Amino acid sequence: MENLKSASPEEDSPRHGDNMGKPKRIPRACDMCRKRKIRCDGKQPACSNCVSHGIPCVFTARPKRRTGQRQMYIKSLVSRLEQMESTLRSVIPNYDQQPDIIHPSSTPKNYHDLNCTKGETSSDDSTDDIAFLNEKMGTLVTTPIGSQKYFGSSSTFSIIQHAAKFASGVESDKVLEHLSMAKSGCLFDPDESFDGSKAELPSSEIANIYIDAYFKSYNPLFPVFTRENFYQKFGSPNCFKKPDGSIDLVNYASYVVVLSLGCLAIADTEEQVSRANALFKNTLGISIEVTKDMSFRTLVFNFLTSVYYCAVSKPNAVWLNVGVVVRVAQTLGLHRNSAMWSIGKEDAEEKARLFWYIYYLDRVSSMMTGKPVAFQDDDIDQMVPFYSIYCYYGLKPPEGDPLGTFNFLEAEVQLTRIVGQVLKELYSVSGMKSNSSQVMEKILEFDLLLNNWYNSLPDCMQPRNRFKIPKFCSSNLILTSAIYYSCLILIHRHSLTKNLQVNCVHRGTGSITDSQALCIAAARSITNLFVESVDLQPLIMKIIMYHAFTSSIIIFISILKRPLASICSEDLNCLISVKNRLISFETHGFVRLNVVMDALESMISTAQAAMQKAKQIAINFSSNLATNEDVTNSGMPDIADVSLKSQSHVPPRISSNHSDTSVKSNSPSSIFDNSGYLNSLNNSILQMHQNLQNSSNTNDQYKFDSVQENELHANITPVLDQTMSMFPFKDQLDLNFAAANVYNPNVFDDMGLDCSFYGNGL
């Protein structure tokens, strides 16, 4: 036997070389003893058992196992298993199988007349899906350098997992890899070395240029200073000195942050951006000492620091620093009514305004990162002073101008308050435990609140009338529009991902009332806002950039769910326009968006492939409908068996380089560019559906789900919902988002000083 050999003398050598009289032994049993499972004495040349039975004694050499890598792999599996068990333990005990239809007894006040039903696919039925589990739990991302970040269910990461679920099977794993990024570990570029160099303060002439740029760009968004007040504090050469001759660190730090923001506002080269960062680093070493002085001036400095982190696209730093600002504000009692203290009216209003700016930033940063808000509404009774849009710019309103009598600060506070309530009721830990009926009730409630807020705005301030916005305040109103659209998406996002059918009839006739259609329409609006916005200062563009990317994912999901809808071509053009706008911003904004571009190109390519496959299926389906067969008795054609491999048409692909792309019709037949034909095809499908329901011998495999009338809103045809069950897509989710080392959802996160990316919209 070739695999058998006798033991070598080296293996049989005794432990002590001087004792040569002992018999040679093998430290393991021979093959026969191992086979019979009896004790072997290991003697050589033959053991006692083999000698007594008269058979040859043979030992087979067995290779030693290398257990190092195997143990590491097992340890990794155990860790991942523990994480999954922890996720399941936290979700399954709260599983509630209540009915998914809102009954009159459970309908909130003023909603008895609302038609609110749910589709065939229950959100609770999907609780075992990875996307829904991660949406409930949030995601803990581990980066390649070992740092960890938590992203809640309102962040971009949550919605992109649903996008990956819908896209699974449409395109190749290689194309979809840019969405999951599971193989590469994350979705941001490697960190560059930190440059700790500082810059000296500029001359008075250059400083005045920076100050002027600050008041034209950043101060109108959060007017913590007036020009007169600022020059009164920082206009003299000795503004940094105390009476005893020591340095006033608070004044110095606040002045430097203003210069840094002004330098950033006029930066048109990378050198100027680096100079702004170097100026700002002068404050990092003294920030702790400054914060020890609990005063209103300290609060102003920390708030300006948060604004700077916004300007350099560091949302996680914004969220952390806002937490410090909130604690300082609460220490100073700014969350309580300032009018009740023994201070002057102007001082009380100044403190109240700064408090509400902090409140605004707290809600916006939490919405983008998916983390909890710091301020709780139950603890706040601060007044909202009157502050018109003209006050933001230090202008006197023209006589008779309605904008001069409208409290714009109060409108911003009300909007961000609704954002906080939505985050708490729909995306917090307790909110994610709600069943489908409760979620639909909350959607109706918050949509009514947001719609009432919208109707309270002056006509020229309403987001749909953005072309009527006065030029002097366009930045403020565009930013407010972006927050409004994003809040609308947050309210109705569950309807899209969980297939909830909610009819918001309180919006009235002539308006979109379907919840899914409202979510998609809001996404289209915010992407159009991003594409059409030009000459805006970087802070606003970077905030809108995040919301535009999130909205692109919503539009991507819409295309995958209804690839035969007549508006899909426009939606695809919308995705391409966002990509081209980001290319322009990347060129002139000194930011790196390579991975964002890859993700967008992956979505565009996948959407094109889905539309092409759906059209090909519709062609085969319409050919079968054109025959004279009795569809009532013959059943539906087995479209799932149509071989797409035999198709000569190859779906268009997006090149790896970030070049301008336009949508071209690649339909096998131009007939699909005609929305009338799609409606005709849709009617044929619905008629077949009715015939199949009336047939006694209909195969269950070909039954259609019921079609709700409200699915026809916003050019969304139900043809896809009837076709997708036969779509030759894979049933399982190929993209793995469950691993800890996955994609950083804030795709533009930590871009500024750490040279990473920025983060998390009718």
Curated annotation (Swiss-Prot):
GO terms for biological process: DNA-templated transcription; positive regulation of transcription by RNA polymerase II. GO terms for cellular component: cytosol; nucleus. Residues 12-21 have a biased composition (Basic and acidic residues). It is found in: Nucleus. GO terms for molecular function: DNA-binding transcription factor activity, RNA polymerase II-specific; RNA polymerase II cis-regulatory region sequence-specific DNA binding; sequence-specific DNA binding; zinc ion binding. CDD domains: fungal_TF_MHR, GAL4. Residues 1-26, 647-668 are annotated as: Disordered. This is Uncharacterized transcriptional regulatory protein C530.05. It comes from Schizosaccharomyces pombe (strain 972 / ATCC 24843) (Fission yeast).
